């Protein structure tokens, strides 16, 4: 299964100990799912990691932005930017996620209301939009696997 993961979801996956991200981590680590991304998505994550509030979160977790980006690099498969989708989002910053999901018939994980509002228009075109991985698993009759926590991902991504 192909996943496109927006920046807030990526933070839940790579930095925060968000329970909703546990089954996604497991699926990515076991190869059950593939995280599709573009260089601009990685750049957005890098930019967001410089925000003061996230710098405090990184410090509290004894983690550096570079570790989060290394974890992204280990888990995500970088692809060229996708062509513009016929379904447009009201926030242009979110459009690349929609474009990539549609181009690869992927599930887009997001909590963004504007992106979620595109779900009904994207579904007939072959892309899903979901707030939670469980919604995706339930639709496919799958169950969540156990997985490691974000700190284990970050340690695995840390350079020697």
Where do the protein language model's features map onto the residues?
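Small, basic N-terminal interaction modules of short regulatory proteins
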Residues: 2-3, 80, 154
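Short, well-structured N-terminal submotif of metal-dependent ribonuclease cores
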Residues: 1-37
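Acidic, PIN/NYN-like endoribonuclease modules and their adjacent C-terminal/linker elements
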Residues: 88-91, 95-98, 102-109, 113-160
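Short, flexible loop segments at the rims of nucleotide/cofactor-binding pockets, characterized by
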Residues: 12-13, 58, 83-90
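Short amphipathic alpha-helical segments and helix-helix/interface helices
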Residues: 24-25, 69, 97-98
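Alpha-helix capping/helix-boundary segments
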Residues: 10, 41, 114-115
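PIN-domain endoribonuclease scaffold, especially VapC-family toxins
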Residues: 27-84
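Residues that scaffold the ATP/ADP-binding catalytic core of kinase and kinase-like folds
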Residues: 13-14, 48, 57, 118-119, ...
């Amino acid at each position: 299964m192909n996943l496109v993961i927006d920046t807030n979801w990526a933070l839940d996956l790579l930095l925060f100990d968000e329970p909703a991200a546990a089954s996604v981590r497991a699926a990515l680590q076991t190869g059950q799912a593939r995280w599709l991304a573009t260089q601009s998505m990685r750049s957005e994550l890098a930019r967001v990691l410089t925000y003061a509030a996230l710098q405090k979160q990184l410090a509290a977790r004894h983690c550096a932005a570079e570790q989060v980006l290394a974890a992204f690099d280990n888990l995500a498969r970088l692809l060229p930017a996708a062509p513009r989708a016929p379904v447009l989002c009201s926030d242009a910053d979110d459009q690349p996620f929609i474009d990539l999901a549609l181009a690869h018939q992927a599930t887009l994980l997001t909590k963004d209301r504007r992106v979620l509002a595109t779900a009904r228009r994207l579904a007939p075109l072959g892309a899903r939009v979901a707030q939670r991985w469980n919604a995706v698993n339930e639709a496919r009759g799958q169950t969540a696997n156990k997985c490691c926590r974000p700190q284990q991902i970050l340690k695995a991504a840390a350079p020697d």
